[in-house]
Structures are given as structure tokens and as C-alpha cells.
């Protein structure tokens, strides 16, 4: 009977056009094989192309040979190794904070940080389009969750005025929003946090390595360095490695070490990952990192311009996330399938990841894409869009 219930629920998912399955993708380069079919990759978060960079691969290999393949314990037992402290020091110097604390993934970081900071009697103010891990962290915390309209600082100000508490008030926002590629108005949000004595946390997963001086992210890009209590970032996107971190004060770090369950009850990141991440942090601050960021920006502008010229209502912007709105989930799935047949791999994004009626192709561009590859992708998106009546 229990399995029959699961089967019925899965059948409904299929009926609603929301069924998901896994596809095998070889490597993260612009040209890949997807289940044996050659295609241009336009849905990877490998923004700077560092996942294939030889310096990261060499650092990982050297660390595995020197330290082994696993930390074999949580950091509070015996899994706190010198490489953890080394990487945290590099992170805090890069992000301009007192210190930093590593987590095993962006999801583990957001759920672990938010559920540790807030609890009953506290209030969390979250942008309506924040990542699911932020929402899940808020729900796990037991705090009251108030979601404000997307990037609307006037609405946030009203909500902060209306909802007082003797406990903690925490404002959480994405820096770059993962489905639309737009940037949070951090100047205004930081002003409100200070005015209303609230903590401010920014999820900078999609901006680290991409925006700001030396790729420091949206906090630097928006000019609010020193005004954000917690900067959450990841290594699995522009930095080409794996894991996540909180760049913060020593007080917040100590608090999280004692309260964050996703940190306390997880085996810590392995040596190879730590070394690769450290190499990436160094690289994005160097001249090569600046060159890659410029190429990424140029490619983002080219992709947006060509899609706009084709007739798509694509927003202007400087981030590598470029949404092509489709609408219905079933049409989006067909669009993605047809694109793969045309030699372009772009995943369709459907509910619950995005609201109903806003399904889309989430195109992402990399620094390693050539102008010709971008033109090929747009030509295919244009052909299929006309075929399906989207364009």
C-alpha cells in the first residue's frame, strides 16, 4: 500500500508535465556528450571554466596523495585538518571578513546557517524568489517566515515596520537570483537592516568569482562590504570545485560551530576538494581571473543581444544567467528535448523550481564559449521557438 501511494503520486507528477529524470553528461566543457549525443552545453554553472582548469586538477591530485581521499570525520571530531583552516583564511581575506566557515554544499550551508541563527520568537524576512534552500532553512528554524515581493525594498521596509519582535530579525536574499539572473538591491536592503537592527545574510552562490573586484561577489559589486553579517558562497559554480562557506565575523563563526546541525553532523570536505577550492580562490583574484570575468561578461552580453534580436524578451544584465521564458511546463520540456536534437543542451526549468506559468529555458553562458558557439545556440533556440509557437 505505501509503495502504491508513491506510484500514484509519481503518476500525477508525470501527468502534470513535471516528471524529472537524470541524464548522463560527460565533462563541463562547451562541447559535451549528453547520453552519447554531442551537444553545446548551455546550462552549466561552470561560469569561468575552472572545473577543467589544470591548476585545480593538479592541486586536488597532490592533496589526495599527501592527505588521503577523506577527512573521515566531522570537524568537531577528527576531521578538522590544516587544509580547512588554510582555505578559510584565503576566503576571509578575499571576501573582506574576519573569518569564514566551510560547509559541504550550498544547501547544507543555507539550511544549517539559517536554522542555527533563528528560532521560535524570531522573524525571517526572505525575498519571494530566494533559493529553495533558504526557504527550507527558514522552515526548519521554527522562526516566523515573511516573504517580501521580489527585490522590493519599499515593501520590505513596510514589513519591517509592521513586524516587531524581542528576538532576532534576519533578512535573507540571494545576491544574484538563480532563475532570473538579476541582482538584489543590496544598498537599500543593507540600509534597512541597519535602520531596523536586523541581521543581513546574502546568498552569493552565483556571484562569487563573477562580480565585483577580484570576483568578490555582489557585496563588493553593490558597495556594501562590511555591512553584511553573513555572506554565503559556493565553490561548485564559478570556482569549479565543490562545497560552500559562510564569510562572517568570529562571533557568527563560533555560534555556527556550536549550533549548525549540517556542520556538526557531517563528515567534513575531503583534502582534494579543499586544495582545488584554494587554487580557485587564488586564481580568480589573479590576472587570469580578471580576463576570464571579462570574457564571461562579453559572452553574457552577446547571448542576450542575439536572443533579443531574434525576438525573445530577454532582460539586459551582466550575469551569466539568461532566462528564455516559455510559460507552460509541457512546452518547456518539448523545447529542451528538441534543442538537444538540434545539438544544444539547455535544461527546461519547471515548477516547483519556478512558479506555475513561468517555466523557462535557463541558459547559462561560460567564459569558455566562443562567439560562434553562442551564435549556433541562439540559431537553434530561434528555430525551435518558432516551431513550437513560443517565438
Curated annotation (Swiss-Prot):
Binding positions for substrate per the UniProt entry: 20, 131, 353
Pathway assignment: Cofactor biosynthesis; biotin biosynthesis
EC number(s) per entry: 2.3.1.47
Protein name listed in UniProt: 8-amino-7-oxononanoate synthase
Physiological role: Catalyzes the decarboxylative condensation of pimeloyl-[acyl-carrier protein] and L-alanine to produce 8-amino-7-oxononanoate (AON), [acyl-carrier protein], and carbon dioxide.
GO molecular function, one term: pyridoxal phosphate binding
Keywords, comma-separated and alphabetical: Biotin biosynthesis, Pyridoxal phosphate, Transferase
Subunit structure and binding partners: Homodimer.
SUPFAM superfamilies: PLP-dependent transferases (SSF53383)
Listed CDD domains: KBL_like
Listed Pfam families: Aminotran_1_2
Enzyme class, first EC level, given as a word: transferase
Catalytic activity entry: 6-carboxyhexanoyl-[ACP] + L-alanine + H(+) = (8S)-8-amino-7-oxononanoate + holo-[ACP] + CO2
A GO biological-process term: biotin biosynthetic process
Binding annotation for pyridoxal 5'-phosphate: 106-107, 178, 206, 234
Cofactor(s) the record lists: pyridoxal 5'-phosphate
Family named by the database record: Belongs to the class-II pyridoxal-phosphate-dependent aminotransferase family. BioF subfamily.
Entry-linked Gene3D superfamilies: Aspartate Aminotransferase, domain 1, Type I PLP-dependent aspartate aminotransferase-like (Major domain)
Chain positions with N6-(pyridoxal phosphate)lysine modification: 237
Biological source species: Trichlorobacter lovleyi (strain ATCC BAA-1151 / DSM 17278 / SZ) (Geobacter lovleyi)
